[in-house]
Amino acid sequence: MAARLVSRCGAVRAAPHSGPLVSWRRWSGASTDTVYDVVVSGGGLVGAAMACALGYDIHFHDKKILLLEAGPKKVLEKLSETYSNRVSSISPGSATLLSSFGAWDHICNMRYRAFRRMQVWDACSEALIMFDKDNLDDMGYIVENDVIMHALTKQLEAVSDRVTVLYRSKAIRYTWPCPFPMADSSPWVHITLGDGSTFQTKLLIGADGHNSGVRQAVGIQNVSWNYDQSAVVATLHLSEATENNVAWQRFLPSGPIALLPLSDTLSSLVWSTSHEHAAELVSMDEEKFVDAVNSAFWSDADHTDFIDTAGAMLQYAVSLLKPTKVSARQLPPSVARVDAKSRVLFPLGLGHAAEYVRPRVALIGDAAHRVHPLAGQGVNMGFGDISSLAHHLSTAAFNGKDLGSVSHLTGYETERQRHNTALLAATDLLKRLYSTSASPLVLLRTWGLQATNAVSPLKEQIMAFASK
């Protein structure tokens, strides 16, 4: 149930299928509600990390923070030998954020897998691009979501004097401030929970997912559409132990398939394909599923002589202009079996909020943007939001400013929209460009991939952008 928008002068219900109706009117009056400096609505990875970032900020030592999580507290007493099928690719920038408040140490003491190279290639041609670093720095880390959540929970428990966490608590109503000319004089946000309890906050941060109740309540428009794809995830056992420090991604005509390292013998699968094919993959027997995965990575059945010849000609021309070592295509490790019950699917889509902030409101993570998993940037975009917003709020707290003032919230919005919009557009373009086997488009992307792979500075810029 989406939270309903209420004016201070009485409840205003939205008409069927309309956006929230707002009755702005000046209000004044006393209240005995508990007041928090910041309330974070949504206690998933991004919401919990946002609460941690503020809870450990030196300029927030005298602030009160509330984290609302609709689900129960997740306790990870000990690691299971079986890996979870829900993992995230953590960029170096995100690892730095997690390190800033101590969560990364917990992750390192539990389990994660670093990868130092990434190979991306086309199923319809020989075109590929290889990302690696000469100094052998880690390009990223594959971490189970449960491990990240455990680390964040531990760190939240250590600052319980600053951060209050309410589990099984969901906001059902927000009472919004009137849009006064001066944000500093604007009333605070009133929040009503399902059990009837109420709070006030100087700043409400929406981290409540792509169906964000905060975003809907404040009336921020969201541009979104569903893709004609679902993602199948699973935990795979390799045929033999390997160093397994490469992330593999192949663009099939039906969608990208990725193999992400978990250990010497295990990898995580993310296969984006049509809804019908995804349902088949989840329901087929193990042997057929394993054969389908290996074929998706190894088969050249979608190649054509015309595309291969044209690609070879460009590769030859590039070698004449730049006679350096060219990346040779490598094959990923073969898969032997799949963990029982690890296969699940979820639908894919794109979304982007027209605004990230309003007076006393900020959106982060999936509440502000939703992206296709082919870029592996979903949670990293959310962590990037946290780094930016926490910086602006810390500066405001240091200077004694109102945390809910748009004067510094818009700085966060400008920074993150510039970054996120570019990434969303590029990801959507790649999804559409690689979802076809039409020869002209295959040739275009083949030449584009080969040219990009040949220009080292361009590859370095791409890696730098993705690592933030």
Swiss-Prot record:
What EC number(s) is this enzyme filed under?
1.14.15.45, 1.14.15.46
Sorted alphabetically, which keywords does the UniProt record give?
Cell projection, Deafness, Disease variant, FAD, Flavoprotein, Golgi apparatus, Membrane, Mitochondrion, Mitochondrion inner membrane, Monooxygenase, Oxidoreductase, Primary mitochondrial disease, Transit peptide, Ubiquinone biosynthesis
Effect the entry attributes to changing residue 261 to L: In COQ10D6; uncertain significance
User: Any keyword Flavoprotein?
Assistant: yes
Topology in the lipid bilayer is annotated as: Peripheral membrane protein
Query: According to the lineage, what is the superkingdom?
Result: Eukaryota
**Pathway connected to this protein:** Cofactor biosynthesis; ubiquinone biosynthesis
UniProt tissue specificity:
Widely expressed.
One GO cellular component term, please give it. Answer: Golgi apparatus
Q: What does this protein do?
A: FAD-dependent monooxygenase required for two non-consecutive steps during ubiquinone biosynthesis. Required for the C5-ring hydroxylation during ubiquinone biosynthesis by catalyzing the hydroxylation of 4-hydroxy-3-(all-trans-decaprenyl)benzoic acid to 3,4-dihydroxy-5-(all-trans-decaprenyl)benzoic acid. Also acts downstream of COQ4, for the C1-hydroxylation during ubiquinone biosynthesis by catalyzing the hydroxylation of 2-methoxy-6-(all-trans-decaprenyl)phenol to 2-methoxy-6-(all-trans-decaprenyl)benzene-1,4-diol.
How would you summarize the oligomeric state and partners of this protein?
Answer: Component of a multi-subunit COQ enzyme complex, composed of at least COQ3, COQ4, COQ5, COQ6, COQ7 and COQ9. Interacts with COQ8B and COQ7.
Q: What PANTHER family does the entry give?
A: UBIQUINONE BIOSYNTHESIS MONOOXYGENASE COQ6, MITOCHONDRIAL
Xref: HAMAP family: COQ6_monooxygenase
Q: Which disease is it linked to?
A: Coenzyme Q10 deficiency, primary, 6: An autosomal recessive disorder characterized by onset in infancy of severe progressive nephrotic syndrome resulting in end-stage renal failure and sensorineural deafness. Renal biopsy usually shows focal segmental glomerulosclerosis. Mutations in COQ6 may play a role in susceptibility to Schwannomatosis, a cancer predisposition syndrome in which patients develop multiple non-vestibular schwannomas, benign neoplasms that arise from Schwann cells of the cranial, peripheral, and autonomic nerves.
What name does this protein carry?
Ubiquinone biosynthesis monooxygenase COQ6, mitochondrial
